[in-house]
């Protein structure tokens, strides 16, 4: 079975289908001042956040219509569009803006929430320690707190009983929501991840959709 075919099955499992592949397209937002769609990169993201002290409207938490065959409580992540959906009853979902894996670090698959934590400890994986001098300083673990890269909350993603090393977590860089910036984890701003953490149960199904990304080995 080809990778493309497998990803199609993942999307069918979610009971929904997104538009054409967007993995190579730059994120865009609507600029109400100029009434134009503009590219949203790291520079513009920092400028917008510094000016407004909040995310662009598209990436703010909101309830939206959402059709899916998945039951309420399921998390569906659209990595290409930078949205996380928490399925709600009545054909709705809570939509959160997210940051996702940068080029070469995106992934797709079906996993579950294995455990959760408040103000989690950050322990960088060996691969990150090897390539990142800053991460190497915390090889034994960085205690939770306002400077911790995992932010205020973390949902740990498992395949069966195995930790995937991927997380849904907060961030100390809220302006990065809407961008491809991480090493594979899904990041939300701290207010949003705190809200999500309060609603999600351990064992919840998590479907990660990202066209053009590598599939997690369990799919």
Predicted feature residues:
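N-terminal pre-domains immediately preceding structured catalytic cores
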Residues: 2-219
């Amino acid at each position: 079975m080809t990778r493309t075919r497998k990803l199609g099955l993942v999307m069918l499992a979610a009971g929904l289908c997104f538009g054409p592949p967007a993995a190579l397209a730059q994120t865009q937002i609507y600029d109400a001042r100029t009434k134009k769609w503009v590219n949203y990169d790291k520079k513009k993201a920092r400028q917008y956040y510094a000016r407004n002290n909040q995310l662009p409207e598209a990436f703010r938490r909101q309830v939206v219509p959402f059709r899916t065959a998945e039951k309420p409580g399921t998390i569906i992540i659209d990595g290409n569009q930078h949205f996380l959906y928490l399925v709600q009853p009545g054909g709705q979902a809570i939509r959160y803006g997210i940051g996702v894996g940068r080029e070469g670090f995106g992934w797709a698959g079906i996993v579950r929430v294995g455990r959760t934590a408040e103000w989690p400890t950050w322990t960088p994986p060996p691969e990150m320690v090897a390539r990142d001098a800053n991460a190497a300083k915390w090889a034994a673990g960085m205690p939770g707190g306002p400077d911790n890269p995992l932010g205020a909350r973390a949902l740990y993603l498992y395949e069966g009983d195995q930790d995937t090393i991927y997380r849904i977590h907060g961030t100390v860089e809220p302006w990065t929501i809407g961008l491809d910036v991480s090493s594979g984890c899904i990041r939300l701003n701290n207010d949003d991840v705190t809200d999500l953490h309060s609603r999600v149960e351990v064992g919840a199904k998590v479907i990660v959709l990202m066209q053009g990304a590598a599939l997690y080995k369990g799919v």
